[in-house]
Amino acid sequence: MTGRRLSTLLASVTAAAAGASLLTGCGVLPGATGGSREPVTVMTWAPDQTRATNMPGMPAMAQTYARWVNSQGGIDGHELRVLTCNEQNTPTGAAACARRAVREKAVAVVGSYSQNGRAFMAPLEAAGIPYIGGYGITEDEFTSPLSYPVNGGLAALLAGHGMQLAADCGTVSLVRPDTLAGDRLPKLLDAGLKKASKRGAVDIPAVEDATEYTTQATRARNKAGTADGCVAAVLGERTQTFFDSFRRLPESAGGAEADDSGSDSDSGSDAGREPIRISSVLGSVGQPVIDRTGGTRSPFEGAYVTGWYPEADDKSWESMRKVVKEHAFADNRVDPTDTGVQTTWIAYTVLKQVIESLDADTVTSARITQALDHGARVETGGLTPPLRWMYEDLLGAPDFPRIVNHAVTFQVVRKGRLVAQKPGFVDVGPTLTNRG
């Protein structure tokens, strides 16, 4: 760890300790007693009510899961107690949630979302607490020996998205956050595009929490050109805002900028222009966004979308939908079509099967970690390939060594629903390991 990284992390942790009493949105879900075995305490965190990405459905799904398993006697006789915490989309908030997990003696952090990996992983590593099934948004989730990811994160999504777009797109404009994490995205998308001998995407950084994106939308359209052009946006919750700006662009682009060769990239007239295809990845565009923006009349109709899991209407989600229907108690935060909710469900599936494999009266973080490191195999009912985190299962890709699930799905919006464009999973492992 560099001195700069260490000092930054220490500053975050110190600030978290000082501000812990101000943390809001934390709670614990009591449940029915699970029998004579000791309760198991875990934590799920996510940002809520912030100006950027919010994931309130993830802690809500964790609480729903606890109500379900506790109504059936707990996990292998253990009552499941779920702590929740608002990560606030800040390093201080993330570190505070992690330190709370340590204080409350959580044996794992499960199915959580944070963009502040450096801030939360250090406290967890110091306490030996495993991080199971994080959303996959940070580098630390794929490098820390105590992280057990259930998907391939943004790396898999972007590489897969490049592969999906390569079949139909000539030039691709990528609109992505102007952040350190966002700086990685163009190379990942290009890895997928170049697998099909396509040139790299035009990189268009954008402020993550902007209220409109007219400038970036204009540039993206101009750069995509008129023949087989595609515009991909990966801006989290602000993706909808971007495509709203994109949809509102005038038919004539007028003052088009020059392209990289110095020639005019748009004649200023859209006569005969073929519609530019739009695209994104799950987490930036999903069924809830499509529903909110008009369903069959949504601007996302026809969009290509790359995901980690099967489409929301797939029968493999039946068990989750049943649990949500019976135990979410009309909590509208728990949307079974939301990618965050789905990730939390899969993460708790991992936790449940690992605890059951222990067959112990007391469950500790060390026992969970040992089980995961020594070959605990988790079946998710077709939501992912079988999951296991032994050394030989790790992809070992540069920057993302702990990826074990390098499968993605290709989807498309048809008649207002996300449906499979291509059946089954697509393996992006070779693309990630061989990228330049």
Regions found by a protein language model. Give the residues of each.
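Extracytoplasmic "Venus flytrap"
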Residues: 28-65, 72, 87-92, 178-182, ...
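Extracellular/periplasmic periplasmic-binding protein-like sensory domains
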Residues: 248-345, 428-429
